[in-house]
Amino acid sequence: LPVAQALKAQGTKVTGIIGFRNKDLVILEDEFRACCDELIIMSDDGSYGQKGVVTMPLEEKIKAGANFDEVITIGPLIMMKFVVKTTKPYNVKTVVSMNPIMVDGTGMCGGCRLTVGGKTKFACVDGPDFDGFEVDFDEAMHRGTMYRDFEAHAREAECNLLKKEVE
């Protein structure tokens, strides 16, 4: 949303395509409408907007001759990967906003390490925005699962002190 707002404020024509799993998860619709010249809402299940994923109207618009100077994609890695797969054959510049785990903000911990253009980059200092054609999404998605067990444990764990009765 802040990117769309900033682009609109500088006079850029903004086409927004936002996607959600279902109607209950739709957020910031009014805010997007306020800064987009055109807004397309997609829901996986068709309960709101058009049924499908964001790449569907994106490809339709490109095939119909829409002349996008740039596509900016922000969201889940799998979605960004497929946005890039959609725009690349048409050579539409695509910027992805990567948001891996960032611990220290200096690149020292390596938690936000990515491969971009065959080189190691750190989202916290080199990004978070990168040329989508250069990002190794498969590696990024694999790295995103590294802490899955720890995260599950953190959600399920209980403090033993809370289990004791107060004397």
For each predicted feature, which ranges?
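Local cysteine-cluster metal-coordination motifs and their immediate loop/turn environment
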Residues: 1-2, 77-79, 99-129, 157-163
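FNR/FR-type flavoprotein reductase catalytic core
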Residues: 1-103
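Short secondary-structure transition/capping segments
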Residues: 14, 63-68, 94, 116-122, ...
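Short Fe-S-cluster ligation motifs
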Residues: 27, 34, 122-126, 130-167
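Short acidic, glycine/serine/threonine-rich loops at helix termini
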Residues: 84, 107, 135-136
